[in-house]
Amino acid sequence: MPSQPSDAPAAGAAPAPDPWWLPDVSGLTVGVVGGTGEQGRGLAFRWAAAGLPVVIGSRDPSRAAAAAQEVAAATGGDVRGLGNAECAAAAAAVLIAVPYAHHRQTLMELAADLAGRIVIDCVNPLGFDAHGAYVLGVPDGSAAEEAAAVLSGSRVVAAFHHV
């Protein structure tokens, strides 16, 4: 697993005394599972442009490689494309940006690779038909709560839930 920032408090230690303390994450690799879609690719682009190493993941590694090449060419960043499991294993923080229809299954398949990592879930539980998008019910309450339930060994946070 990628190492934690050297200035981070030890696991299980009390929080830093300074409430404004933040670890230096400038060298940490960010993974984007679902990085070939609009939202995942857009966030990968922004992180690469900011200088973070990025790994784009996809069920189809060749699509991930093509997306990574596009993002790297546009940003000059360190961007690689891999399969979803390899993406999850290569990154310290991993964004989940897959369609809700594949959310639970993807998380279940990646649970071991995501253990101990920060997982950022940006999935909105939406379905689509001829009339457009509609909200889907989620037994766990929200997509992020579903992710937290499936990924009990990860630190799950919710972000980037724009529609």
Residue ranges and their predicted role:
Residues 2-73:
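NAD(P)+-binding Rossmann beta1-loop-alpha1 motif at the extreme N-terminus of oxidoreductases
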Residues 27, 65, 90, 116, ...:
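A glycine-biased structural micro-motif
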Residues 34, 38, 62, 82-85, ...:
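Residues at secondary-structure transition points
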Residues 51-53, 76-78, 116, 153-156:
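A generic structural signal for alpha->beta connector loops
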Residues 69, 108, 145:
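Active-site phosphate/pyrophosphate- and oxyanion-stabilizing loops and adjacent acidic/basic residues
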Residues 74-118, 122-131:
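Rossmann-like NAD(P)-binding element
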